[in-house]
A protein has these predicted regions:
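Bacterial Sec-dependent N-terminal signal peptides
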Residues: 1-21
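Conserved, mostly hydrophobic/aromatic
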Residues: 30, 153, 279, 323, ...
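Extended acidic/polar, glycine-enriched regions
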Residues: 143-146, 154, 159-163, 245-305
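Aromatic-lined carbohydrate-binding/catalytic grooves of carbohydrate-active enzymes
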Residues: 314-362
């Protein structure tokens, strides 16, 4: 009997140690996203930044960053996909009302796999609730050469009746810096893509749209983050992100009580509760981001290289080019000025000339 008890205890300790030592690494040539499983089986982000040269450095990364720092009884960290109704105090990545009406979800690490895909490596992490047959699969594709990471989530369940999703984020990322500067872009007629930079302070900043098919009319689904200082073109640590979704989107930026920033890209949950049937899989849009220590220029070029290579149809093929007179002349043009533009365009090898707003001029 004593031997059986000791064996069970040893097995439990081994299980805990296995969880505690489990490290999941999503890496490009220059960036590491590192996650750890806690002794109780929860998954936490422990690092996102410059790539480690020595793998032994992972052992120094702690998951329980909030322990004894905020007066909480429980140990908490940057949970990779924080849920509503659990011990996390801030904006969740997913919120669900289960079939029995309960609105609490706890996700535990179940498994992870990595496989080679075109241009990179895909990591799939499976999280499950211990009480409900509710599952979230986190997908990350790291493109090593381009230094770009793509992330999305799959949500499913096998409960007795449909569950209601009222938050469903593509991913959740955390950063720790002395200051955070957000640059977003807003638009209006003849004022497209106007940049605006704001220093983030404690609390939430939300960039979103509820215009449906006109989603990008006043807010662009793209942002830049500068760490310690506003994002610059050729220097400084930055992160650029965009969501692959043409409809209502929402970017949430929340600075917590210890100065950590969480970034949550998602479909806008406004008037968008989703009834998920048993066995059905809800797939979120992809979130694509790039980090750089050399400013926005490098990160932007990396995103463009990635998009041409892997996302845009025939992105590496030659493209027809077009010259629109609007940027050159506005409404102030005539036949002679247009003829000069056409000649210059031909000399440059431009394929087509477009006369814009021609009815307003001579």
């Amino acid at each position: 009997m004593k031997k059986s008890i000791m064996l069970i205890a040893a097995m439990c300790m081994t299980s805990v140690m296995t969880f505690a030592q489990k490290v999941i690494r999503v890496s490009t040539d220059k960036t590491d996203l590192v996650m750890k499983v806690s002794p109780k089986g929860r998954l936490y982000q422990v690092y996102l930044g410059d790539k480690f040269l020595n793998p032994a450095d992972y052992d120094n990364l702690k998951w329980d960053v909030y322990a004894a720092s905020d007066g909480a009884v429980c140990q908490r960290g940057h949970e990779v996909y924080a849920t509503s109704g659990a011990e996390d105090f801030f904006e969740p990545a997913v919120a669900v009302t289960h079939a029995d009406g309960n609105m609490t979800t706890y996700l535990y690490y179940k498994s992870s796999v990595q496989k080679a895909v075109e241009g990179g490596t895909e990591t799939v992490i499976t999280l499950q609730d211990k009480v409900y047959p509710f599952t979230v699969k986190l997908h990350y594709v790291a493109y090593a050469k381009e230094n770009v990471i793509k992330a999305w989530s799959e949500i499913s369940h096998n409960e007795k009746s449909p569950v209601t999703l009222w938050r469903y984020s593509s991913t959740m990322l955390y950063f720790k810096s002395s200051k955070y500067y957000l640059t977003n872009y807003h638009s209006d007629w003849a004022k497209e893509g106007q940049p605006e930079t704001t220093q983030l302070s404690t609390g939430k900043k939300i960039i979103d749209t509820k215009l449906g098919t006109r989603a990008a009319m006043q807010a662009e689904p793209f942002f830049e983050l500068g760490f310690d200082e506003p994002a610059k073109e050729n220097e400084g640590k930055v992160m650029l992100g965009t969501i692959g979704w043409p409809g209502n989107f929402r970017f949430t930026f929340e600075v917590d009580n210890v100065g950590a920033l969480r970034v949550i890209p998602a479909i806008n949950p406004y008037a968008s509760d989703y009834k998920l049937k048993a066995g059905e899989v809800f797939t979120t849009p992809e979130f694509i981001f790039a980090m750089s220590d050399n400013g926005m220029g490098e990160a932007s070029r990396n995103l463009h290289d990635w998009a041409r290579q892997y996302q845009v149809n025939m992105g590496m093929d030659d493209r027809l080019t077009l010259l629109n007179n609007w940027e050159n002349t506005g409404f102030d043009f005539n036949q002679q000025s247009l003829a000069e533009l056409m000649k210059d365009a031909k000399d440059l090898g431009v394929d087509m000339f477009l006369l814009d707003d021609g009815w307003f001029a001579k």
